Amino acid sequence: MSNFFKETDVDTSQAEASVTETLKNCDDGELYLENHKSESIVLDDNKIKSSTYNSDQGYGFRAVTGEVVAYSHSNDISKESLRKSSDNLKETLKSKKGTYNHEIPKTNSKYYENINPIESKTFDSKIDLLNSVNNYLRSKGSIVNQVTANFLGEHKSIEIIRSDNQVLKDDRPLVRFNVSVVLEKDGKKETGVYGVGGRQSYDDYLKDGS
């Protein structure tokens, strides 16, 4: 079963049936589902300054006939919500008729791994790494006045259901690690900043001894 329907009253086959029935007389369209999770952990002045986590999901239902485009969206993935969206689309396009274009060119190119960086490490291990960075930099001398380090992690899941039950999926990881250091000596301050990130897991950038 799709991850989008695990905690709802609708399953994949019901969603596919809704898409097929709604778009049967349309030129184009799809049900686009998206789930987005993000986290941020900031260490500053020898302590964890902030920690945030957000999670959102929803869908967009699109139907196209000729020059008319109908669109409905909701953050509630349920039978009733999909039914209302379907009714709204059909009402908008009821005077139009077309032939659905099923084909979508596929590249099947793999640009990044199918991973969830937020779940790839425990919260405690992320805190330990930030503390390790802080301790390492401060061990370089008393001129280290301030250290700020933070993790930023995102994971976005996308699923597109076409009227012929063709399902396209993509999981997009994104991580970033930033650190800034303020040095002070003889009343003079200097700041150094470094950052690294990409569509990978935390492990690709933060390893023991690195």
Model feature map: region roles:
Residues 39-94:
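N-terminal alpha-helical targeting/anchoring segments
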Residues 65-71, 95-100, 107-112, 183-188:
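Low-complexity, flexible helical/coil segments
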Residues 52-65, 168-197:
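Short beta-strand elements
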Residues 46-48, 53, 123, 165, ...:
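Short capping/connector residues at structural and topological boundaries
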Residues 36, 66-68, 77, 154-156, ...:
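Generic structural motif
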Residues 1-20, 26-40, 80-171, 201-210:
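Acidic low-complexity segments
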Residues 22-23, 66:
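Short, solvent-exposed coil/turn segments at beta-strand boundaries
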Residues 77, 194-203:
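Short, solvent-exposed aromatic-acidic interface loops
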